[in-house]
Amino acid sequence: TTEEMIETYDVNLISFNLLYNTIKPYLVDHAHVIGISSQAALVSQANAAHYGASKAGFSAVLNALRLEQPELKVLNAQLGPIDTPFQKNADPTLKYFKNYRHMMIQPQQLAKQIVEGIILNKIEINQPSWMQIMLKFYQLCPRTLEKLCPNLFKNKV
């Protein structure tokens, strides 16, 4: 619906910009800004266009912020599905959860990686890493992969 589309952009893109503009005067040099984005920013999926677009926009904002404000440490965590209660709440049928639980990131493991990323001044965390590699390949020849493996791009209900 139109309302869901607006909410998706509001939650995933607009809210960060509003929050950042509010806290910007209080940030000190070398402050860390951590953005939780999605691997969906790198791929087109049926029934998830606005989610992917909002996350792609968010990743672009984080990358631009890193360039515009070099005194900040900006970390973009581009993630696949995470094993949280959100998965069950978003799809009461649990179809997505059951189909993809085996590849879901564990929150405790992810938190550790983000803390390590902060300590090491990383600019990106991409998890799961195999998905990131696959999506880089997708970016080289998207239409070919969409034709050869159409079900990979139609997993959202």
Which residue ranges define each predicted feature?
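SDR active-site lid
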Residues: 66-129
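Residue(s) in the substrate-gating loop at a strand-loop-helix junction
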Residues: 38
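Substrate-binding pocket helix/loop in short-chain dehydrogenase/reductase
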Residues: 1-6
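Active-site loop immediately N-terminal to the catalytic Tyr-X3-Lys motif
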Residues: 45-49
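A short helix-coil junction within the Rossmann-fold of NAD(P)-dependent oxidoreductases
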Residues: 22-31
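Catalytic Tyr-X3-Lys helix of short-chain dehydrogenase/reductase
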Residues: 24, 57, 62-73
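Active-site helix of classical SDR
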Residues: 20, 54
